[in-house]
C-alpha cells in the first residue's frame, strides 16, 4: 500500500487535524478500487461494481450542488472584490460568512477528520503552470479521493516531490453544523471558503461536484483579476488548430457537443483563456448519464469503464446499469480521467486562441431559433443574460424545465461581478477575431427537443464556416440573424415560427420570453456600458 509518501501527520496538524491513524497519499486507481468495494463499508461510502467495470456510488439526498449552503468569509481580502449576494442588483450565491462562524465550521470538520484513516490527494487545477492552483484534498472517503483523482490534473512523480499546496479542501461530508440557526445560516450543511486561509470546508453534503465547482469558483476569482478569462465552457480543436469554446449551463450539451470524433477535446467544462490561448482547468470529465446510449453518445459511453466513477445511477442485480432510470435524480453522472476519451489534446489540455464562441441555451419556451449569428453587442448581451431552462436535477429541488438567467452561463460559480467576465472575454475575442453564435439545444413549437443529430449538423456548419457564408433573415422581436438553410439540417426547424400551428402562437410565447429577458437585464443598466447593451436585446 502507498501510504503517506513523505506526508506526515504533523503536516495535517497544521490544518487542525490531529491523531491521524494513517495517511493514504495520492492512492493509485487500483488501491481506490479495492477501498471502494471493501465489503465492510456501509452507507454512502460503499461502492458497487457495474458490468462496465466502473464503480457506482450514491450521494444520498445531495444529488446536486447546494447553492443555498455556499458561504465566503468576508474579510479584508474579499470585502471590496467579491460579488456579494447582499449587495447590488445582481442575485447570486456568494453569501458572506463571519470569520468567527468560519472558525466554528473549521472546528467541526477538523474534529470529524481527526483520529481517522485519511485519503490525501494532491492535484492541480489549471493546465497552465504559471496560473494553476496546487490543491490538497483531504477526505475520509475513498470514492471522494477517486473523484478528485479523476477530475483534477494528476501531477507527475517529479511534481509531487516538490508539491506545495496553494489551497486546502477539507471534506467532512459526515459532519453537520447543529448551530446553524443561531448563526443565521441556511441549514446544517455548508460549503464554505476562506480566501485569506485559502481553504474550502465541506460539511453535510456527499455530492462530489462541490469539490470540483468549489475550485472553479476560486479560479473564477483569481484569474480575471489578472486579465485572464475564466469560463464555464467546453472546448475542442480541429485539424487545422481552430479552437471552439462552448458556453452553457449544466445539461445544455457542453460535454456532448464538444466530444466530437472529428475534433480533439481540450476539456468539457472549465477553461481559461490567456495570452497563449485556451487551457483546461481539469484533468477529467463529469458527464450526465441520464438516458445515455451507446448509439447517441459513443465516446461518453465508452469512457465508462474501470477507473470511471458513476454517481446515483440505478445498478441492477446483475451489475448492468439502467441509464433511463431517473428515480434517484435526473442528475446522474460519471466522472472519468480525460484520457478515457480517445480524441484529446495531448500531452497538456491546451490549444491556441478560440475563433468560434458558441453559447448553448435550452429554451423551454420554444421561441429561440436552433442557431443564430451574433453581433458584437449581442454577444455581450447574451453572455450577460445567460439564458437557459434549468434542466431537471442539476440542483436539488428542480425536476421540471424552468426558465432561468445565469450570468456568463455560470452565475453560481462567479466570484466577481459578471461585467468583469464579459470585459475580459470580449478583449480576448477581439484580439483573436472570434465570432459568437447562439445555439438552442432545447425545445421547439412541437414540444419536442431539437435532436442531437440536427444540433451536431448546426455545430459542423459553424465550425467549417458554411454558416458564415449562408444567407440570413432576421427573427423579429429578438433581431437574431438566422440562416435560411444549412447542410444536413431540416430547413423547416431553422425558423422557430414554422414549428407552431400559427405564427400568432409563436408571437405570444415570444412576447413572454422577451419580457423576461428585458426584466432580467435591468440589473446591468446601472452602468453606462450595461445601459448601452439594452439595444442588443429583444424589443417589445
From Swiss-Prot:
PROSITE patterns: PEPCK_ATP. Its EC number is 4.1.1.49. Substrate binds at residues 65, 207, 213, 333. ATP binds at residues 213, 232, 248-256, 297, 333, 449-450, 455. Pathway: Carbohydrate biosynthesis; gluconeogenesis. GO terms for biological process: gluconeogenesis. Its cofactor is Mn(2+). This is Phosphoenolpyruvate carboxykinase (ATP).
Amino acid at each position: 500500500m502507498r501510504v503517506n509518501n513523505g506526508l506526515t501527520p504533523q503536516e495535517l496538524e497544521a490544518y487542525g487535524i490531529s491523531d491521524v491513524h494513517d495517511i493514504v497519499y495520492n492512492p493509485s486507481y487500483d488501491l481506490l478500487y479495492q477501498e471502494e468495494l471493501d465489503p465492510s463499508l456501509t452507507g454512502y461510502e460503499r461502492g458497487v461494481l457495474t458490468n462496465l467495470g466502473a464503480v457506482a456510488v450514491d450521494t444520498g439526498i445531495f444529488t446536486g450542488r447546494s447553492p443555498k449552503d455556499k458561504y465566503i468569509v468576508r474579510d479584508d481580502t474579499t470585502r471590496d472584490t467579491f460579488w456579494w449576494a447582499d449587495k447590488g442588483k445582481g442575485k447570486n450565491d456568494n453569501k458572506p460568512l463571519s470569520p468567527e462562524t468560519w472558525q466554528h465550521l473549521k472546528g467541526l470538520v477538523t474534529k470529524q477528520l481527526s483520529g481517522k484513516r485519511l485519503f490525501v490527494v494532491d492535484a492541480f487545477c489549471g493546465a497552465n503552470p504559471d496560473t494553476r492552483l496546487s490543491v490538497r484534498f483531504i477526505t475520509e472517503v475513498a470514492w471522494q479521493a477517486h473523484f478528485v483523482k479523476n477530475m483534477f490534473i494528476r501531477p507527475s512523480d517529479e511534481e509531487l516531490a516538490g508539491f506545495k499546496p496553494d489551497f486546502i479542501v477539507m471534506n467532512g461530508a459526515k459532519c453537520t453544523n447543529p448551530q446553524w440557526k443561531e448563526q443565521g445560516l441556511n441549514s446544517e450543511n455548508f460549503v464554505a471558503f476562506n480566501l485569506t486561509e485559502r481553504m474550502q470546508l465541506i460539511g453535510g453534503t456527499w455530492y462530489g461536484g462541490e469539490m470540483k465547482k468549489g475550485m472553479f469558483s476560486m479560479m473564477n476569482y483569481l484569474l480575471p483579476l489578472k486579465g485572464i478569462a475564466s469560463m464555464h465552457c467546453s472546448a475542442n480543436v480541429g485539424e487545422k488548430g481552430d479552437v471552439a469554446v462552448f458556453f452553457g449551463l449544466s445539461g445544455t450539451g457542453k460535454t456532448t457537443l464538444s466530444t466530437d470524433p472529428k475534433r480533439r477535446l481540450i476539456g468539457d467544462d472549465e477553461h481559461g483563456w490567456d495570452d497563449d490561448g485556451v487551457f483546461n482547468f481539469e484533468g477529467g470529465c463529469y458527464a450526465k448519464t441520464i438516458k445515455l446510449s451507446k448509439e447517441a453518445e459513443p465516446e461518453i459511453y465508452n469512457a465508462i469503464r474501470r477507473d470511471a466513477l458513476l454517481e446515483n445511477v440505478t445498478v441492477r442485480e446483475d451489475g448492468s446499469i439502467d441509464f433511463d432510470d431517473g428515480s434517484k435524480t435526473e442528475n446522474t453522472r460519471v466522472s472519468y480521467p480525460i484520457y478515457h476519451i480517445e480524441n484529446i489534446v495531448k500531452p497538456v489540455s491546451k490549444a491556441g486562441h478560440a475563433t468560434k464562441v458558441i453559447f448553448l441555451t435550452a429554451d423551454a419556451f420554444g421561441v429561440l431559433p436552433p442557431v443564430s449569428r451574433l453581433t458584437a453587442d449581442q454577444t455581450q448581451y447574451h453572455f450577460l443574460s445567460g439564458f437557459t431552462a434549468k434542466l431537471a436535477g442539476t440542483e436539488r429541488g428542480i425536476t421540471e424545465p424552468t426558465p432561468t438567467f445565469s450570468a456568463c452561463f455560470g452565475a453560481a460559480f462567479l466570484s466577481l461581478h459578471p461585467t468583469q467576465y464579459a470585459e475580459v472575454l470580449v478583449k480576448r475575442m477581439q484580439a483573436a477575431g472570434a465570432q459568437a453564435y447562439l445555439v438552442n439545444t432545447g425545445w421547439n413549437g412541437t414540444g419536442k427537443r431539437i435532436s442531437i443529430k440536427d444540433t451536431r449538423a448546426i455545430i459542423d456548419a459553424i465550425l467549417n464556416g458554411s454558416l458564415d457564408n449562408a444567407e440570413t433573415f432576421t427573427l423579429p422581436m429578438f433581431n437574431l440573424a438566422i440562416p435560411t438553410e444549412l447542410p444536413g439540417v431540416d430547413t423547416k426547424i431553422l425558423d422557430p415560427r414554422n414549428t407552431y400551428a400559427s405564427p400568432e402562437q409563436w408571437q405570444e410565447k415570444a412576447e413572454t420570453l422577451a419580457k423576461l429577458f428585458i426584466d432580467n437585464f435591468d440589473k446591468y443598466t446601472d452602468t453606462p456600458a450595461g445601459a448601452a447593451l439594452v439595444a442588443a436585446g429583444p424589443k417589445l
